[in-house]
Amino acid sequence: MDQQPERREGRSFPERKGQKRKLEEGAAAVEDREISAVSTDGGQALLSEVAAQVSVLNSAFSWQESDRAAAKRATQVLAELAKNEDLVNVIVDGGAVPALMTHLQAPPYNDGDLAEKPYEHEVEKGSAFALGLLAIKPEYQKLIVDKGALPHLVNLLKRNKDGSSSRAVNSVIRRAADAITNLAHENSSIKTRVRVEGGIPPLVELLEFSDSKVQRAAAGALRTLAFKNDDNKNQIVECNALPTLILMLGSEDAAIHYEAVGVIGNLVHSSPHIKKEVLTAGALQPVIGLLSSCCPESQREAALLLGQFASTDSDCKVHIVQRGAVRPLIEMLQSPDVQLKEMSAFALGRLAQDAHNQAGIAHSGGLGPLLKLLDSRNGSLQHNAAFALYGLADNEDNVSDFIRVGGIQKLQDGEFIVQATKDCVSKTLKRLEEKIHGRVLRHLLYLMRISEKSIQRRVALALAHLCSPEDQRTIFIDDNGLELLLGLLGSLNTKQQLDGAAALYKLANKSMALSPVDAAPPSPTQRVYLGEQYVNNATLSDVTFLVEGRTFYAHRICLLASSDAFRAMFDGGYREKDARDIEIPNIKWEVFELMMRFIYTGSVDITNEISKDLLRAADQYLLEGLKRLCEYTIAQDITLESIGDMYELSEAFHAMSLRQACIMFILEHFDKLSSMPWQNELVQRTIPEIREYFCRALTKSTTNLQSLRL
C-alpha cells in the first residue's frame, strides 16, 4: 500500500524560468532588442541571422580582440534565440552546434598575440550557455555529446585551477555545470559518459567553491547525475561529497540547501548502503531543520528524504520523531502547496510504522489534517494520507481519537480515486474494528456516557459499524447507544438522519447474522395434515363452509389441529360448535380455498395479487404459519412508493415479520426516501417500533451467541 512519490531531476534553464539576466549596457541592450525582433519575425530573417552568427563563430577563432568580441556577441545572439524553444530546431539545423563546440575551448595562443587575453573565459561561457539551451531534446543532447562537448565542458569546470579568480571564471564554470545538467537530464547514457570523462570529481570539488552560484550549479549537476545511476552515486560518495553536502543543508541561501537536499535524496533513493552512510555522516538533524525552511521546495525534498530514511529497512523512525520532525510535518499537511502536503503525508506514513510514533503523531494533532486530505482530488496525495491513517490505526491509543474527530464517518463516506486507496481505507476500518474490545471499548463507552452530545453520537455511530456482535447488547441496550442512534434518526438534520439510518441498518444486519429472519419461513409443525386429496372433498367430511354461495367440504379433526380460532369455533360456546353448515362472510372464495389448502397440506403458492387478502384471513383465523408466508411474499414487493401502505398493513394485521421488513427497507433506502414529502412523518411513526425491534433483536442475538458458545 505504501507508494513512494517519484523524485524528479533538476534542469538548469535559468532564463526560461524567468530569472533576470544582466546584459551589458549600451550597444548590448540595442543588440538584444534586435535579436528579439528576429526571433519574432521568423522565416528568412531568422535563418539569415543564425547563418550569420555561425559564420562569425567559424571564422573568429583567435585571440584578436575583434574576433573575441565578435565571437562573444555571436554566442549571446544564439543563446538569446535558443531561449525560445520553438527556434531550437532552426538553430541546430543552421549548424550552430559544431560552431559553438569550437569555442568551448580557448583559441591557440600565437607569438604575435597580446599578453592580455581579451574577453578571457567569456566566449567559452557563452558557448556553454547556448549549448545547454539547445539540449532541450534528447536527439540534440546526443548530437552535442557525440560532437565531443563533454571533455571541453569538464575542462571548463577546472578553469579555477590555474590560480585565476574572477567573475568571468566563476561564470564560465557555472555555465559549464549547467550545460552538463541539461545534457544529462533524463539521459542515462550521457550521465555515464560524464562520469567516464571525469566530470564528477571536479563537480564535487566545486561544492566548496567560494561563489554561491557555482556551488549551486555544481550541486544541480550532481543531483542530475545521481538520479537513477548507481555508478554515479557511488563515485559521488567516494569523492567525499557527503560532508560538504551536509554542511550545505544548513546554508542560509535557500537555493543552495534546496540543491543539496536534492542531491542527497537522489543518492539515497534505492541505495540502502548510501542511506546508511548519509545518516552516519550526520544528515538527519539538518534535514529535519529544513522542514521549517522558508523555501517550499526544500521543505518538500526534506520531507521526501525523511520518508526514505524511515523506510521499513531503517531503524531511525523513532530518532526522526525524537529530533522534532512531527510538528513541522503536521504543519506542512495544511500548506496550500499540494506537493508539500503529499511529501509530508508520505513521511508521516513511513514514521507511522512504529507503535510509539503512531501515538505521538496522533497526540500532536496529525489525525485531523490527514483525514481532511482524504477530500483531495489528487490521487497521490489522497493515497499517502490514507496510508498514514492506516499506520495510525494500528495503535489502540488512537482508536478513540479516530472516533472522537469523526474519522470513521470520513473513512466510510470518502470518495477515493484509485483502487489502492479504497483497499487501504477498507483495511484501516478493519484494523480499527479489530481493536474495539477490552480497554478500548471501555474507553469508548465512557466517552459515550460523559462526553458532549456530538461526541456521544460519533461513538455510537462508530460502534454500530465496528463493534463485535457479542458487545451489541452492552453498548446499545445497557449503555443507551440505541437511544443516541434513534435521536439521530429523528433529527431534523438530513445528514444526521442518514448517518443514524446507516448505523441502524448495519447494526440490524449484524444481529440478523446470528438470528436470520429474512429467509422464507419453513412450514410450521402441525400434528394433522390430511393431504391434498382431502381438500374440499366430501369423503368423511363432517362440516361444510358456505363461502360466496359455494360449498367447501372440510374435516373438523384437521381444523381443530390448525389454530386456536378453529378450536374455539368447534370446542367453545359458539353456535358453530354443532352446526353442519357454517357461513363464512367477508372472504373471497379463492382466498378461503388457499387458506384451507394450507391447513390440509402445510404449504401453498401465494401470489402478490392475493397475498394481502390471504394475510387478513390468516390473521383472522390465527394461522401463524400461513401469516408468515404471506408476510414474506408481501415483503418482496416493498418499494419506495408502497412502503407507507405496507407499514400500515403490518400494523393492521399484527404482521411482525412484515413490519420488520418495512423497518429494514426504510433504514436501507433512507437516502432515497428522504426526498418523499411524507418521509419524516413515516420515520417519526416508526421510531417506537424500531426501538422495540432492536431491543428484541439485540437481546435475542446475544442469547443466541451465548448458546452457540455453550
Swiss-Prot record:
Compartment list: Nucleus
Phenotypic consequence of gene deletion: Abscisic acid (ABA) and glucose insensitivities. More efficient germination and postgermination growth.
Pathway listed: Protein modification; protein ubiquitination
Tissue/organ expression: Detected in embryos and most of the vegetative and reproductive organs.
Record GO biological process: negative regulation of seed germination; protein ubiquitination; response to abscisic acid; response to salt stress
Disulphide bonds in the chain: none
ARM repeats (start-end): 85-127, 138-185, 188-227, 230-269, 272-311, 314-353, 355-394, 429-468, 470-509
Assembly and oligomerization: Interacts with ABF2. Interacts with DUF7/AIP1.
Name of this protein: ARM REPEAT PROTEIN INTERACTING WITH ABF2
